[in-house]
Regions:
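N-terminal cap/lid segment of alpha/beta-hydrolase-fold proteins
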Residues: 30-68
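Short, solvent-exposed loop/turn and secondary-structure capping segments
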Residues: 79-93, 131-134, 169-171, 191-197
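Conserved alpha/beta-hydrolase
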Residues: 106-128
Length: 253
C-alpha cells in the first residue's frame, strides 16, 4: 500500500513538473502591436527572457525578407548618477537603463525595416560589464525569434563597443546560430584590458589637451563612476574641439 502511494505521488510530481516545463515558454511569449515606424507599418513585439532581460523585435509585416539583425548595445552604467553628471548618450540625473535596444539609432532601424529586414535586441539582465550573461540572453532571444518568426532564414549579429565584443564572442561560441556578424568599434576582451586601453587614451588627452583630466586614483563606488563620467565629458569636449578645428581648417582652403 505504501509503495502504491509512493508511486502515485511520484507520478503526480512528474506530471506537475512536465506541465511546468511545458507552459514555461508561454510565460515569455511576446506582446505585439502594430506601429507606424518611418515609412513602414511594423509589428513591434516585446517581452522578457528567462533571466529577466527586456527584449524587443520589430518586423516589416508587409515585406519581411527573412533576415533579422540582432543588436547588442554598448556599456551602460550600473549605478544611478546624480544631477550634473551626464554620461555620453545618457541623461542627468542618470537612472540605470534596462530598456531593450534594437539598433544604433532610430534612423538606421527604420531604414532596415523599410528594406525588409527585422531588427531585435535586448537590454540584457544587468548593466556594467555584462558580456557573459549578454551572450546567454542573445542565444535565448535567437530561439524566441526563430520560434515567433517562423519565416526567419538567418540572423545577423551586430553591436558597438562592448556590444561589438559581445557580437564577436557570440559568433565564436555559437557560429551555427547566426549567418554573419558585424562587431563595430569593438571593446577590449575583458575589464582589465579595457581599463588599460582607457587609461592610455586618458593619458594622451591629459598630456596633450587638458591637464585637468584624471587618469587614475578614482574614488570607490558611485563617486568614482561620477568622476569617470566627468572625465568622459572632458574627453568628448576635446574631441569636439579637434573635429571643429579640422573642419574650420578644411573650409578655409
Amino acid at each position: 500500500m505504501k509503495k502504491s502511494r509512493f508511486a502515485a505521488l511520484a507520478v503526480a510530481a512528474s506530471l506537475v513538473t512536465m506541465s511546468a516545463v511545458a507552459i514555461a515558454p508561454a510565460a515569455h511569449a511576446s506582446s505585439c502591436e502594430a506601429k507606424q515606424l518611418g515609412s513602414v507599418i511594423a509589428e513591434v513585439c516585446s517581452g522578457k527572457t528567462s533571466d529577466g532581460a527586456n527584449y524587443e523585435y520589430r518586423t516589416n509585416t508587409e515585406n519581411f525578407n527573412g533576415t533579422v539583425y540582432l543588436w547588442s548595445h554598448g556599456y551602460r552604467y550600473a549605478v544611478n548618477l546624480p544631477a550634473g553628471i551626464q554620461p555620453p548618450g545618457g541623461t542627468t540625473p542618470y537612472i540605470v537603463d534596462m530598456s531593450a535596444e534594437v539598433g544604433p539609432s532610430t534612423y538606421v532601424v527604420n531604414q532596415l525595416l523599410a528594406a525588409g529586414y527585422a531588427v531585435a535586441g535586448s537590454g540584457f539582465d544587468t548593466q556594467g560589464w555584462t558580456v557573459g550573461s549578454a551572450i546567454k540572453t542573445n542565444v535565448e532571444l535567437i530561439g524566441i525569434l526563430k520560434s515567433e518568426l517562423p519565416d526567419t532564414k538567418g540572423v545577423i549579429a551586430w553591436g558597438a563597443s562592448m556590444g561589438g565584443f559581445i557580437t564577436q564572442a557570440l559568433a565564436e561560441r555559437f557560429p551555427k546560430l547566426i549567418k554573419s556578424a558585424a562587431p563595430i568599434c569593438t571593446a577590449a576582451g575583458n575589464v582589465n584590458a579595457e581599463l588599460t586601453y582607457a587609461q592610455d587614451l586618458l593619458w594622451g588627452m591629459k598630456t596633450f589637451f587638458d591637464p585637468s583630466i584624471t587618469v587614475s586614483g578614482y574614488a570607490d563606488g558611485p563617486a568614482g563612476v561620477g568622476q569617470a563620467a566627468l572625465n568622459l565629458q572632458k574627453v568628448i569636449a576635446v574631441l569636439t574641439h579637434i573635429g571643429t578645428t579640422i573642419l574650420e581648417t578644411d573650409n578655409s582652403k
